[in-house]
Structure formats: C-alpha cells, structure tokens
Amino acid sequence: MISHTPEVQDINSFSRFEFLKETYGIIWAFIPIFTPVLGITIGVLVIVWLEREISAGIQQRIGPEYAGPLGVLQALADGAKLLFKENLFPSRGETRLFSIGPSIAVISILVSYSVVPFGSHLVLVDLNIGVFLWIAISSIAPIGLLMSGYGSNNKYSFLGGLRAAAQSISYEIPLTLCVLSISLLSNSSSTVDIVEAQSKYGFWGWNLWRQPIGFIIFLISSLAECERLPFDLPEAEEELIAGYQTEYSGIKFGLFYVASYLNLLVSSLFVTILYLGGWNISIPYIFVFDFFEINKTYGVFEPTIGMFITLAKTYLFLFIPITTRWTLPRLRMDQLLNLGWKFLLPISLGNLLLTTSSQLFSL
C-alpha cells in the first residue's frame, strides 16, 4: 500500500491557506465600513461627555462621576437603559411612519459623513459636489421628524414636526448661499479641494478671515439646523412637552438624541473644513521629521496628524454651541422665521454678490 501523507498534508495546508485568505479578504472588506462607524460612535460619546461637563461647570455643579472615570461611560449607561426599555406605540397612530421616522433622521445624517475629509487621504468619497451633497442629504432629516410627528397622532408631536420642517426650510437657504460663496473662493465644491485651497497661506489663508460674515451666518444657520438653543423650538418643553419625541420610548427615543448629536458633530466638522482650514496647521511639522531622519513614516504620520488636527478644531468649536445652550434664551417661532427670512437671507445674498464681484475683478 502506497502512502500519500505528504501530498495530503500539502493539500490540507493549501486549503487552510485559501480559507485564511478568504477570511482575511472578508474582514478587510468590512474594515472601511466599521472604522468610520466606530469613529463616529466614539465622537458622539465624547460630545455627550463634553456637554455634560461644560454644562456642569457653567452651572457650578458636579457633572456625572459614577459611570466610569470622570463619568465618561455615562452616555453608554443611558444608551443601555434605553435599549432595554419597552417600545410603545400610540393606539391610533400611523405605525409605519412612527417607526420609520427616527431611522430616516439617523441614516440621512450618517450618509453625510461619507464626504467629510478627516485628514489627508482620509475621506470615503471625494465628490466634485461634496458640500452640496451634504446640504441635500441633511435636508432629508426634517422629513423623518415630520413623519414622526404625523405618525404619533398627537397634536404636540405634529406641531413639533411642522416646526422642524419650517425651521429647516428657513435656514437651509442662507446655509447654501454661504457654502456657495466658499465654493466660488475655492473654485471647487469638493471638500478636499476646499481644504487644500486654504493651505496656501497657512493660518491667514483660512476662509474665516476672507468670509467673516459668511462664517457668522453659517454658524447661526447650523445651530438652527441642529435644533440647538436658542433654536430648539421643535422640542420646546414648556410649549410642546417634547415635540415630535412626545410619544416615543425605548431605543426609538434614543435615536432622536443620537441624530441630534450626529448632526451637531457633522456641522462642526464642516465648519472646520469650510472655514478653519481642515487638517492644515501653520506649524511646519514635516521639517521636524526631516531633522530626525524618519521620513519613511511620513506616509502614516501625515494622515494621522491631519485627523488629530481636524478633530481638535472640531471639538474646540463645539464649545460655542454648548455654551450658547446656557446663555441665550429661546426665540419665539415668529422671531425665528423673521431672523431667517428677513435678516440672514438678504445678508447671505449680499455676501454672495460681494464674493462673486471680488472673484470677477481678480481675474
């Protein structure tokens, strides 16, 4: 009898190698999907912790301190609590609209992260219309809020959904005009090109100095889009109990808060990209690496330090919306609409005309 043990071992090792290769390929295919999701999740948890700590400091009290060191895990504890709570449905409401509304609000905002360049060569999709894609996708979120308000069969919820839709329409136009001014200055609507256009003159090349009026209008409009104080009329507790969230419980109730913080984070990221130079920094860090003769790591170092700079600018900017929550009173609905249509819209139009004129004269 002839033994074929070496051949059998070779076949087994080859099949094991092919299996490992296929497994590695599957895991590698999912890494680009799970990495941004993990990063966004951590970013939202950091925002929640920052808001609670800053709010506690402003009110001269102690913030969360029991869940993890310095209360870092408090947001995870709240999320776990909502995850295991019962999902209740209104007796005479539209069940489909009631269930789909929160998902539309979250998914539409998550898609916006696909065009955000976190650093050099760290962007999922570099489109020629990146900034306008963000505006188009973010305008879908109020539709989900309106569906939630209508499907709840509650007058407070329906009024909250109507307010969210009216507020989004009022402030979407000034926001778009400010973005259009930035596109004219950069000769591109790609988020990557806009950041690179600000890198020519370092710190003084940021669009913040060339578009100060546009920056202020963009800041106010983004606060209104995120429904942050003083623009939180869709969920005003004193008037509408909780607005479109009134009939929700459990994980669906938590999805609205996730959508709110996701929207706040992506708005702050776009402020960093459009006005604060993105991943660029005026310090020439590359010369430090040349001096220590470690140029081989530059391919890894540049995207990493770029992502760190982008996130640092973003979280520093987040102090503004968090602070305004405890310093400014809520506007009335008529004041909010007047501010959007009678003030911000004409000023943003004038800013666009000035930008267009300056670009024409510079040719």
Curated annotation (Swiss-Prot):
Keywords: Chloroplast, Membrane, NAD, NADP, Plastid, Plastoquinone, Quinone, Thylakoid, Translocase, Transmembrane, Transmembrane helix. Disulfide bonds: none annotated. GO terms for cellular component: chloroplast thylakoid membrane. It catalyses: a plastoquinone + NADH + (n+1) H(+)(in) = a plastoquinol + NAD(+) + n H(+)(out); a plastoquinone + NADPH + (n+1) H(+)(in) = a plastoquinol + NADP(+) + n H(+)(out). Its main location: plastid. It is an enzyme of class 7 (translocase). Pfam families: NADHdh. NDH shuttles electrons from NAD(P)H:plastoquinone, via FMN and iron-sulfur (Fe-S) centers, to quinones in the photosynthetic chain and possibly in a chloroplast respiratory chain. The immediate electron acceptor for the enzyme in this species is believed to be plastoquinone. Couples the redox reaction to proton translocation, and thus conserves the redox energy in a proton gradient. This is NAD(P)H-quinone oxidoreductase subunit 1, chloroplastic. It comes from Morus indica. The gene is ndhA.
